[in-house]
Amino acid sequence: MVSLFWQTTGTGDRDLVLLHGWGLNAEVWSYIVPRLATHFRLHLVDLPGYGRSRGYGALTLEEMAEEVASRAPHGALWLGWSLGGLVATTVARRCPHAVAGLVTVASSPRFCADGDWPGIRPEVLEGFARELRQDFTRTVSRFLGLQTLGTASARQDTRWLKSVVLAHPAPAIEVLTGGLALLRTSDVRKALDQLDVPLLRLYGYLDGLVPRKVVPLVDELSTASHSIVFAGAAHAPFISHPVPFCQALCDFSQLES
C-alpha cells in the first residue's frame, strides 16, 4: 500500500507546496520553515518513494506530478528544488488553473548536458547510478558534497544535508536510480514557453549541477519569468543564503497575490 507523506504547518494565509530534490526528503526545508511559517501555510511533501512516502516504485515525471497534485490545495504556490523543480513544473503544465505561481530552485528544464545546452555530463549521472548499487551511503554523500561545493559554509551544509538523508529510512535503490534516470532524460524546455502561471527561478552562482550558463538560455525560453542568481550560493541556496532566499519568496508571493 502506498502512503504519501504530507505535513502542513504555518500561520500564513497563502499555501506553499515545497518539493525536495533527489535522494532527500521534506526535512530539508526545516532550515527555512521558521522564517516562512508566519507568511505561508507550508505543505511539506516527501516525494513518492522518498523519506516517509513508502510503497512506491520508480515513477515517471507525470506519475509523480499526478500523485502530489492530487493532495495539494487549489491555488497554491509551488516550489520545487532540483528534481522537485521538474515535478513542480509538470504540475503547473498539467494543472495551471490550480497553481497560483511556480518557483524553481537550482533546477533546469534539462539537467543533462546536450550539445550547446550546459548541464551535468550524462556519464556522471550514469556513474552515480552504478555506484548506488555498490555503496549507497558513499554515493549519496558524494552527491550531497557536490551540492554545496564552493560555498563558504560547504562543510557545515553538507553535514546538515547528510543528517536529513539519514533521519529516515533510505529510499529503495529502484527509486533512486529512477530519479537519476529522470534527471538524465527529462526535457521540459518546450513546456516552459507554454506555462500559463507566474514563474520565479532561483539559482546559485557556484552551482556545479545547474551551471549559471543555463540562466540566460532559460530566460529566452520563458520570457515572462524572472530569475535571481544568489552570489556565493551553490545548489542549495535556501541553506547557504536563507535570508535573501526567503525574502525572494515573500516578494514573489506579494506580487502574485
Swiss-Prot record:
Reaction equations catalysed: 6-carboxyhexanoyl-[ACP] methyl ester + H2O = 6-carboxyhexanoyl-[ACP] + methanol + H(+)
GO molecular function annotation: pimelyl-[acyl-carrier protein] methyl ester esterase activity
Annotated compartments: Cytoplasm
Known pathway: Cofactor biosynthesis; biotin biosynthesis
The EC number(s) this enzyme carries: 3.1.1.85
UniProt entry keywords in alphabetical sequence: Biotin biosynthesis, Cytoplasm, Hydrolase, Serine esterase
Active site residues per record: S82, D207, H235
Domain AB hydrolase-1 residue range list: 16-242
Residues binding substrate: W22, S82, L83, F143, L144, G145, L146, Q147, H235
Statement: the UniProt record of this protein carries the keyword Phosphoprotein: no
SUPFAM superfamilies (alphabetical): alpha/beta-Hydrolases (SSF53474)
A single GO cellular-component term on record: cytoplasm
The family this protein is said to belong to: Belongs to the AB hydrolase superfamily. Carboxylesterase BioH family.
Protein name, per record: Pimeloyl-[acyl-carrier protein] methyl ester esterase
